[in-house]
Regions:
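Acidic-and-aromatic substrate-binding clefts and catalytic sites of carbohydrate-active enzymes
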Residues: 82-86, 211, 238-245
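Membrane-embedded segments
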Residues: 57-139
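Hydrophobic membrane-insertion alpha-helices, especially the h-region
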Residues: 6-23
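Short extracytoplasmic
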Residues: 41-66
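Conserved small/polar residues in nucleotide/adenosyl-binding loops
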Residues: 267-270
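Secreted/periplasmic serine-hydrolase-like ester/acetyl group-modifying domain
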Residues: 121-228
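Substrate-gating cap/lid alpha-helix
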Residues: 233-263
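Alpha-helical transmembrane signal-anchor/signal-peptide segments
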Residues: 26-41
Length: 270
């Protein structure tokens, strides 16, 4: 009996050690995303008129509570750090599992970028916070392809991020923005850090066509919105870099009966 108890205790200690080592070694700045996902799913079902999805350009740049105070509609910011287009599409689909918004905002900073047949990174990793459903399985299949080792790394981060032992720093122990803070701000995560920025003239930006992989995801978003009678607004947040897809997004929006808003150039408001 003592041997059995000893074996069980050892197994428990090893299991707990692996779990917490994996937590310590997970990529920096992903804990916020886990809290953001938990916060969103703690909200009452069907309680928001407007939901925004996208990268840090939205979750750090769109104060939805101020929108509510000014205009009276309920809104939630379901953006997270980094986010290539297929990650944003996953969050969009996940949002509709519990909410029935009238308007969806999709931020388009990374509209040309899609994770396909790639190794695990921090962005893909934090989607672990989203529970299993068809859209998530499709997302992981697109990200990982047929490589089973990538799935193993996804579920056991100790295997994927063991090299982080040499990069453990303050942020490895940081608890991030709390679930309660996200709940109070309805997903918005602002900052009091101000950096003077010069916005370039958009008329000088090279314009490119959208990749086929991006168009397929945009079509998916449009079709889901049409089926659910949701008004769809794509928008691009002004920033100091060069954005090459404002013309393509304006054309796409016009062709698909939705809206594209580019605050830098109001000629792209359709």
């Amino acid at each position: 009996m003592k041997k059995i108890v000893c074996c069980i205790s050892c197994a428990a200690i090893i299991g707990i050690s692996v779990f917490y080592a994996g937590r310590l070694l997970q990529p920096n700045f992903t804990v916020d995303a886990f809290h953001a996902i938990e916060s969103f799913h703690s909200m009452p079902e069907n309680s928001f008129d407007v939901i925004a999805c996208g990268s840090s350009h939205v979750y750090k740049g769109l104060n939805v509570n101020e929108m509510t105070e000014r205009y009276g509609f309920s809104a939630y910011n379901y953006g997270c750090n980094w986010q290539f287009l297929n990650t944003t599409t996953l969050f969009f689909e996940d949002a509709l599992r519990t909410q029935s918004p009238k308007v969806i905002l999709i931020e388009t900073f990374n509209v040309d970028k899609v994770h396909e047949d790639t190794d695990l990174n921090g962005e893909i990793y934090y989607t672990k916070g989203i529970s299993d459903f068809k859209g998530k399985r499709e997302y992981l299949a697109q990200c990982f392809g047929k490589n089973k080792d990538r799935y193993l790394s996804y579920y056991i981060p100790l295997l994927a991020f063991h090299e982080n032992w040499t990069n453990v720093n303050y942020y490895s122990f940081d608890s991030g923005t709390s679930v309660e803070e996200y709940q109070a701000a309805h997903g918005f995560s602002g900052s009091d850090h101000i950096v003077p920025t010069v916005i370039s003239n958009p008329a000088t930006f090279e314009q490119k066509e959208l990749p086929d992989s991006s168009v397929r995801l945009l079509d998916k978003i449009v079709n889901i919105c049409n089926k659910n009678n949701i008004r769809l607004i794509f928008y691009t947040v002004p920033y100091e870099g060069e954005y090459n897809y404002s013309d393509a997004m304006a054309e796409y929006a016009a062709a698909n009966n939705c809206t594209y808003l580019n605050p830098v150039s109001y000629t792209h408001l359709t």
